[in-house]
UniProtKB/Swiss-Prot annotation:
Localization annotation: Cytoplasm
Cellular component GO terms held in the UniProt record: cytoplasm
Listed GO biological process terms: cell division; chromosome separation; DNA replication
Description of how the protein assembles with itself and partners: Homodimer. Homodimerization may be required to stabilize the binding of ScpA to the Smc head domains. Component of a cohesin-like complex composed of ScpA, ScpB and the Smc homodimer, in which ScpA and ScpB bind to the head domain of Smc. The presence of the three proteins is required for the association of the complex with DNA.
Protein name from the UniProt record: Segregation and condensation protein B
Record keyword Cytoplasm present: yes
Function: Participates in chromosomal partition during cell division. May act via the formation of a condensin-like complex containing Smc and ScpA that pull DNA away from mid-cell into both cell halves.
Record keywords: Cell cycle, Cell division, Chromosome partition, Cytoplasm
Protein family according to the UniProt entry: Belongs to the ScpB family.
Length: 180
C-alpha cells in the first residue's frame, strides 16, 4: 500500500478526532515537508484531508453534502449495530458510567456507538454528582422503546432466558411500534 492509502486509512480510523501532525510524522516515518506534499497530492473523488490547527482530519468534500444529508436521514431510521447494542446494554445495566468505563468493559473504542445512541436519543451525557467526566445514562425514550417504566424493570440474569431473548429482540427492532 502506498503512503496515500496508509494516510487515508489512519485518518479514517481516527474518525472525527483526526490525528495530530506529530503522530502522523512518527507513524509514517517522514518529514513535515514530505507530509505536506503527501496531503497536497492526496486525491480522492469524495474525500479530502483538512488541517485544523495541528490536527489532520479526513473529511468529505462539500459537493457531497446533499447526498450525505440524505444518508444521515436514512441512517437515523436504521436499526442499531451489534456494537451499539452492546454499548447500550452496558450503559443500561451499569449507569451512570463514562465513555472510558465502557472502553474498559469492552476493551475497544466505543465512541461511534455512543454517538449513535446519543443521536437516536436512547442515551444522554450528564454531569452526575460532580464527576469530572460526563456520565452516560439511558433516557425516557429508551424506556419507551423497550416498553419498561423504569430501569429496574430490565431483565436480570436470574430471570428466564426467554424474557432476556424477548428484551434483546425488541432492542434489535428498536425502531418499531413503540417509537412512532
Amino acid at each position: 500500500m502506498d503512503n496515500h492509502g496508509i494516510l487515508e486509512s489512519l485518518l479514517f480510523t481516527a474518525g472525527d478526532e483526526g490525528l495530530d501532525e506529530k503522530q502522523l510524522l512518527e507513524i509514517l516515518d517522514m518529514s513535515k515537508d514530505q507530509l505536506v506534499e503527501l496531503i497536497e497530492n492526496y486525491s480522492s473523488h469524495g474525500l479530502m484531508i483538512q488541517r485544523f490547527g495541528m490536527t489532520y482530519v479526513l473529511t468529505t468534500k462539500k459537493e457531497a453534502a446533499t447526498y450525505i444529508e440524505q444518508l444521515i436521514e436514512q441512517k437515523s431510521q436504521m436499526k442499531l449495530s451489534q456494537a451499539a447494542m452492546e454499548v447500550l446494554s452496558i450503559i443500561a445495566y451499569n449507569q451512570p458510567l463514562s465513555r472510558s468505563d465502557i472502553e474498559l468493559i469492552r476493551s475497544i473504542n466505543s465512541d461511534g456507538a455512543v454517538k449513535t445512541l446519543i443521536a437516536k436519543g436512547l442515551v444522554e451525557a450528564k454531569v452526575v454528582n460532580e464527576q469530572r467526566s460526563q456520565q452516560l445514562i439511558t433516557t425516557d425514550l429508551f424506556l419507551n422503546v423497550f416498553g419498561i417504566s423504569n430501569i429496574e424493570d430490565l431483565p436480570t440474569t436470574e430471570e428466564d432466558d426467554e424474557e432476556m431473548d424477548a428484551f434483546f429482540s425488541n432492542l434489535v427492532n428498536q425502531k418499531g411500534e413503540n417509537n412512532d
